[in-house]
């Protein structure tokens, strides 16, 4: 019934596409206007449109049809490619700030040019986001010819552009291509800069995200982090690892309804959620081994955390599946692409736990200096759009998190690929034997085959079997991806057999010739279902581009993780009832539906996880926005810093009276004026006779102290030129703000790590986190204000010449910039992307400056930040 109704009325997507198609006719009629024009005439016509939008005379909507028509005509002349009508629909979907779902080979790169050209008319910049440097360089170069013809400048941000001036030049272009991590890290670095002119990014106007599902869904659990070393006890990791090895893995025992849950062993592994649950027996054993009474008490939170990570390292994370050991290092394997993510480290001590497990050198844990998730970074843009071949399965998440609707664009030519039912075997061995038999069948007639695997381990197993059968083949996994694009490009040639993990080169088309078409096209064999239907669809989509012939089929076994964890018993029962013998398989739509149901369960779990991360990051995001906004004000020479200092000074005086226990409404005879005078001497180095404050009301005391501070401050500042005064005030304020913000981020990390334990007390961890983080933030703001006033009050100048003055200012600037450069060495990701080469931005330094929490080199026994590193006296400028 539902199907027949849909045939008559169509789906909502059909109706949306139909409405766009009606608008395409308005573009097509303009072809006869622009086609006869010379190149110069076409460029003049376009410039007139561009100027009308930039000046505000017309809106982008007013010129959309003409812009699209001119872009198509220019593309025909420059690239030799004419946009299809369905590509025009895709361009309008992107312009409207939505996601265009387009099948492999439908020309997404060309579609993007329509929306890019139109939106670049505002002069505010357009960012095109790709998944790797190769695609950013390729697309900016190929499409750049079209943009240049229309008078636009094109930039490309890649990891090899190291200097700020070079990166700024790329961002200043009308259109900029780059990877998601380059854009994100530049944003974080910009908000650590000490001069406004050093910032490289412009405003976040409009972005088109290519492979949007990979970046906004798969990597949404991936906070971009700039970090620095922290002072943590490295012995915790080895100790936790030793204890984890003594703990025995148990399991839940089935009990009758109403009976208490029973378990064996010291801990249970929850494979669905990838967590460890300690049993009562295990808790007691761990407490005995750690020699503590309560492992979950606040003072032992670090021990319980490290033990949990050590147990995860030994029981959940697998070598050659989740990570590899190379050159005495743990290197993460990206779960979605299969690539080695060199330079990326797990956070919260998990990476150190894996290092302890594998017996490699345990590297120092890091402290967060700046952080943002992709979710919150991309929500900075005034308008966001995306394109991919697979988005409908995550349409709800795109809508709820990013406000993006997914519109499926029809193919220009109908898809001819045959997608066959899954074949399900009892065991892994039977399945792999069947895959090899099928490969031999295809290979014997020359039909190319692409075999998709979910891990390095599985691709190596297939590789060994094919080698044994003497079938020539290419293998592409995290251990061998240098020639990735070339191997994938050639996977459609006659007789080619290619084994690839999920990395199978997105953005690189597999083309086939007429001979291969006559053999049936490219055959896709999946060796197991991925947790996400999208990844399976991406593998299928490698075949059948632009109406080519092709086929796809998945080979599964009850040993596969997805079936074993999510619903394998149900399928096993079906197989037992059918009496499936060894080597036989089930080819059933019922079973295929059961597999898809299991995938939906996992997808929902991942969605909840991403939503959970966003809920926590939203709390930090409000704080980050407030600090960054104020920081930007401090960088602006036009900002009235004197008014801010005056406002903060009043708060400082109020705080000082409170410290002296003098409050409004108290009888003045109860005022401890001796304590107040002592505080003023200690904090501000001003000698005051306590009798000076005798018999004064609170308001009078505030006015007197404020006047004293103002007089001293103005007398000191009067020797400076207004511009120098402004710069010194801004730089010193930054010198207070930045370290305080970094310490706050560390406190937030500690809070987040332990907040889950509040659930044991029947409290909602998220609510608790919001309350505690708000308290931390209000304390931070208070500390920044008070510390800034104190530093500015205590600063003394002993310049003998303008040159010495400028040298002293430059000295502080360089120190702040050195901290930023140092931090740039420590870019990392919590769970999912390749970090940059840490040597790139390495500053040239002499003697290494002590970190804030290091012991002071003067030998006082105090921490550096509480001794010679205080925001107080400095040679030349501060005394």
Swiss-Prot record:
- Annotated ATP binding sites: 87, 105-109, 509
Main function = Part of the Sec protein translocase complex. Interacts with the SecYEG preprotein conducting channel. Has a central role in coupling the hydrolysis of ATP to the transfer of proteins into and across the cell membrane, serving as an ATP-driven molecular motor driving the stepwise translocation of polypeptide chains across the membrane.
Q: How does it sit in the membrane?
A: Peripheral membrane protein
Give any GO molecular function from the UniProt entry. Answer: protein-exporting ATPase activity
Say which species the protein is native to.
Sulfurovum sp. (strain NBC37-1)
List required co-factors: Zn(2+)
State the superkingdom: Bacteria
Q: Where does Zn(2+) bind?
A: 856, 858, 867-868
Catalyses which reaction?
Answer: ATP + H2O + cellular proteinSide 1 = ADP + phosphate + cellular proteinSide 2
Q: Name one GO cellular component term.
A: cell envelope Sec protein transport complex
Details of cofactor binding = May bind 1 zinc ion per subunit.
Region annotation (Disordered) ranges: 834-879
- For this chain's UniProt record, which GO biological process terms are given? intracellular protein transmembrane transport; protein import; protein targeting; protein transport by the Sec complex
| EC number(s) stated in the UniProt entry for this protein | 7.4.2.8
Location(s) in or outside the cell? Cell inner membrane; Cytoplasm
**Keywords noted in UniProt:** ATP-binding, Cell inner membrane, Cell membrane, Cytoplasm, Membrane, Metal-binding, Nucleotide-binding, Protein transport, Translocase, Translocation, Transport, Zinc
HAMAP family noted in UniProt: SecA
In Swiss-Prot or TrEMBL terms, this protein is called Protein translocase subunit SecA
Quaternary structure note: Monomer and homodimer. Part of the essential Sec protein translocation apparatus which comprises SecA, SecYEG and auxiliary proteins SecDF-YajC and YidC.
| Keyword rRNA-binding on entry | no
């Amino acid at each position: 019934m539902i199907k027949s109704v849909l045939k008559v009325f169509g789906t909502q997507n059909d109706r949306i596409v139909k409405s766009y198609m009606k608008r395409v006719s308005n573009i097509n009629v303009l072809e006869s206007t622009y086609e006869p024009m010379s190149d110069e005439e076409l460029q003049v016509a376009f410039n007139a449109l561009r100027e009308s939008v930039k000046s505000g005379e017309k809106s982008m909507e007013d010129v959309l049809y003409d812009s699209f028509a001119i872009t198509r005509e220019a593309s025909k002349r420059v690239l030799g490619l004419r946009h299809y009508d369905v590509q025009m629909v895709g361009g309008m979907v992107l312009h409207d700030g939505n996601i265009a779902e387009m099948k492999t080979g439908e020309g997404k790169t060309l579609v993007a040019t329509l929306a890019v050209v139109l939106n670049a008319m505002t002069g505010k910049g357009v960012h095109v986001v790709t998944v790797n440097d190769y695609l950013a360089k390729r697309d900016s170069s190929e499409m750049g010819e079209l943009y240049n013809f229309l008078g636009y400048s094109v930039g490309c941000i890649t990891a090899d552009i190291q200097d700020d001036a070079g990166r700024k030049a790329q961002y200043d272009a009308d259109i900029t291509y780059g990877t998601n991590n380059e854009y994100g890290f530049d944003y974080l670095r910009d908000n650590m800069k000490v001069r406004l002119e050093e910032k490289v990014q412009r405003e976040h106007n409009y972005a088109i995200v290519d492979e949007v599902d990979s970046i906004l869904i798969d990597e949404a659990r991936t906070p971009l982090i700039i970090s620095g070393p922290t002072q943590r006890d490295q012995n915790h990791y080895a100790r936790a690892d030793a204890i984890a090895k003594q703990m025995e893995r148990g399991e839940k025992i089935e009990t009758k309804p109403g009976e208490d849950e029973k378990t064996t062993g010291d801990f249970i592994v929850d494979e669905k959620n990838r967590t460890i649950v300690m049993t009562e027996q295990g808790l007691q054993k761990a407490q005995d081994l750690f020699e503590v009474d309560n492992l979950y008490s606040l003072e032992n939170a670090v021990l319980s955390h490290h033990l949990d990570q050590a147990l995860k390292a030994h029981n959940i994370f697998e070598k050659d599946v989740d990570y590899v050991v190379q050159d005495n290092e743990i290197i993460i394997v990206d779960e979605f692409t299969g690539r080695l993510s060199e330079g990326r480290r797990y956070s919260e001590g998990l990476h150190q736990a894996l290092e302890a497990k594998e017996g490699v050198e345990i590297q120092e844990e890091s402290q967060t200096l700046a952080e943002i998730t992709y979710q919150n970074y991309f929500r900075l843009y005034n308008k966001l759009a995306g394109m991919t071949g697979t988005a409908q399965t995550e349409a709800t998440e795109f809508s709820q998190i990013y406000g993006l609707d997914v519109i499926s664009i029809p193919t220009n030519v109908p898809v001819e690929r045959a997608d066959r039912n899954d074949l399900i075997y009892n065991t892994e061995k039977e399945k792999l034997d069947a895959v090899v038999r099928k490969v031999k069948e295809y290979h014997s007639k020359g039909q190319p085959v692409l075999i998709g695997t979910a891990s390095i381990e599985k691709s190596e197993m297939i590789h060994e079997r094919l080698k044994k059968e003497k079938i020539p083949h290419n293998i592409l996994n995290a251990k061998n991806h240098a020639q990735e694009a070339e191997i994938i490009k050639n996977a459609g040639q006659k007789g080619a057999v290619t084994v690839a993990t999920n990395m199978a080169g997105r953005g690189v088309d597999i083309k086939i010739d007429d001979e291969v078409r006559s053999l049936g096209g490219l055959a896709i064999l999946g060796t197991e279902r991925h947790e996400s239907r999208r990844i399976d669809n991406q593998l299928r989509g490698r075949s059948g581009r632009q109406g080519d012939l092709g086929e796809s089929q998945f080979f599964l076994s009850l040993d596969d993780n997805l079936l074993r964890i999510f619903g394998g018993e149900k399928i096993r029962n079906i197989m037992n009832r059918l009496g499936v013998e060894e080597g036989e398989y089930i080819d059933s739509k019922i079973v295929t539906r059961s597999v898809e149901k299991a995938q939906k369960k996992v997808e929902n779990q991942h969605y909840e996880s991403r939503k959970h991360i966003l809920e926590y990051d939203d709390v930090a995001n409000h704080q980050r926005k407030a600090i960054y906004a104020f920081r930007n004000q401090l960088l602006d020479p036009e900002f009235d810093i004197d008014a801010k200092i005056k406002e903060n000074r009043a708060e400082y005086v109020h705080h000082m009276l409170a410290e002296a226990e003098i409050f409004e409404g108290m009888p003045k005879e109860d005022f401890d004026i001796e304590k107040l005078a002592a505080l003023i001497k200690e904090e501000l180095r001003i000698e005051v006779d306590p009798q000076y404050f005798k018999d004064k009301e609170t308001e009078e005391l505030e006015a007197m102290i404020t006047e004293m501070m103002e007089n001293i401050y103005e007398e000191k500042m009067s020797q400076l030129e207004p511009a120098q005064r402004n710069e010194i005030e801004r730089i010193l304020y930054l010198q207070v703000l930045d370290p305080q913000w970094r310490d706050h981020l560390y406190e937030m990390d500690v809070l987040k790590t332990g907040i889950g334990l509040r659930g044991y007390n029947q409290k909602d961890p998220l609510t608790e986190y919001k309350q505690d983080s708000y308290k931390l933030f209000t304390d931070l703001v208070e500390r920044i204000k008070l510390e800034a006033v104190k530093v500015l009050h205590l600063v003394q100048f002993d310049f003998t010449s303008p040159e010495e003055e400028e040298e002293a200012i430059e000295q502080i600037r360089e120190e702040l910039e050195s901290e930023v450069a140092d931090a740039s060495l420590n870019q990392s990701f919590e769970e999912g992307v390749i970090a940059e080469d840490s040597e790139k931005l390495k500053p040239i330094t002499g003697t290494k400056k002590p970190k804030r929490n290091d012991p002071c080199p003067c030998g006082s026994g105090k921490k550096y930040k509480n001794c010679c590193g205080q925001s107080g006296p400095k040679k030349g400028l501060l005394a």
